[in-house]
């Protein structure tokens, strides 16, 4: 990478991370598919794919941070492009969840057995752990907004506190959902209700994990003084992503846990 920026436009330099990220994503979803079909050793493929995805995220973020903080490549025009890129990325993620909701409503509004949920399924009580997780995520949306406002007012102490609280709440949400899965009375292969339930909520849980990692990166960057009230798009993008995760969970809670159960 060149250490000098002679223009304000975003010219992408050669990088291995897009290709490696694609290979990592393919391995992760291959492992997930094999795991769903209960192939032997599929868990190892799944774990390898997850490790590859996390490693790619780490090194790609490292390069982006270097370009922003040490090489001065993130000019105002580049930052505008990154904002559009993040918006389009979130829109593409919305389409993933639209597909899952479509599958769920198609199955629930016109069930083959005439009854929804199917008679052999004991649905989870929406006002037990799902409601607790809803309150946790809503609170985390407040803490990340508090952190953002603190940074805009150059209050670094509250900025850090807000990120830490959001990360803790995200970890608690993940732990509660894992506990819920462990104690559910139905498994992934127990019909269309179970498969759409686990695909939608599990994919959301993966997004919570990614968002928590995203905020953790922002925490370490904040501790190193990387953000200022004028320049903090890295954290702003993480906050957008976290709010997106919050909104998706509200739809999951209302449509799948409450109405669909």
Predicted regions and their residues:
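...captures the hydrophobic TM-helix bundle architecture rather than a specific catalytic motif
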Residues: 1-261
